[in-house]
From Swiss-Prot:
The active site is at D131. This is tRNA (guanine-N(7)-)-methyltransferase. The gene is trmB. Keywords: Methyltransferase, S-adenosyl-L-methionine, Transferase, tRNA processing. PROSITE patterns: SAM_MT_TRMB (PS51625).
Length: 224
């Protein structure tokens, strides 16, 4: 029997580390990172309190992640990212903002959701501007696929939300189809949702808008 390697939603590049990112990656990961493990973790004991838990998949350089966490001290946030300079950048921002409600798991989100987060434990999941993988032969690498959305749904509490934003029209159409096909999810809008106040406009997004790209938000809730 041949076993196929898993299809990844990312390619690990060497990437350029700024001095601050490298320093943060090396010195702050033990403080704000949650190491990958094949065993379930208890987020309430990691944060030292019971509070709503929001997961962000693919936090990139962490600008949005930190802004949202700083504006919502009443909630706890867990970011998942695989790109080392991005992890360093987020760690540096957590330290500079003195945030106690944001941690990062530096690993593949699929494995984190399968092994570390169990049960219906999340109040919300953010996936902002996932890699679009525009070529047809790469579509299988897209994060938003029915199996993955089913896994996300398993981890959401009843009434919890899944929020995706993208500036790629065809990825938005694909995601709308996949989310609408998951029976446990209910669209909060007729199709795309207005950008909620908690999602700040990023520089990347403002640049896209100048180029005429339309940003689409999809916000679905899990049936109670
Ligand atoms: C296009 S970037 C968007 C970053 C950020 N959300 C933003 O809006 O600027 C997508 C990010 O998702 C990360 N990513 C892709 N697949 C992932 C996975 N399976 N687990 C964790 N991170 C992933 C990539 O490393 C990349 O940083």
């Amino acid at each position: 029997m041949s076993s196929h390697p898993p299809i990844r939603s990312y390619v690990l590049r060497q990437g350029y580390f700024s001095h601050a990112q490298r320093h943060a990656y090396e010195s702050l990961l033990p403080r704000y990172g949650i190491p990958f493990s094949e065993n379930p973790i208890d987020l309430d004991s990691i944060f030292g309190r019971t509070a709503p838990k929001i997961l962000e998949i693919g936090s990139g350089m962490g600008e949005t992640t930190v802004e949202i966490a700083a504006q919502h001290p009443e909630k706890d946030f867990v970011a998942i990212e695989v790109h080392a300079p991005g992890i360093g950048s987020l760690l540096d921002r957590i330290e500079k903002h003195g945030l106690t409600n944001l941690r990062i798991i530096p690993h593949d989100a699929k494995l984190v959701l399968q092994h570390m987060l169990t049960g219906e434990s999340l109040d919300g999941i953010h996936i902002f501007f996932p890699d679009p993988w525009p070529k047809a032969r790469h579509h299988k690498r897209r994060l938003i696929q029915s199996d993955f959305v089913s896994l996300l749904c398993n981890r959401l509490k009843p009434g919890g939300y899944l929020h995706i934003a993208t500036d790629w029209e065809d990825y938005a159409i694909h995601s709308l189809h996949v989310l609408s096909s998951e029976q446990r999810l209910i669209n909060t809008a007729a199709d795309y949702a207005p950008r909620p106040a908690y999602r700040p406009l990023t520089k990347f997004e403002q640049r896209g808008m100048k180029l005429g790209h339309t940003i689409r938000d999809l916000i679905f809730t899990k049936a109670a």
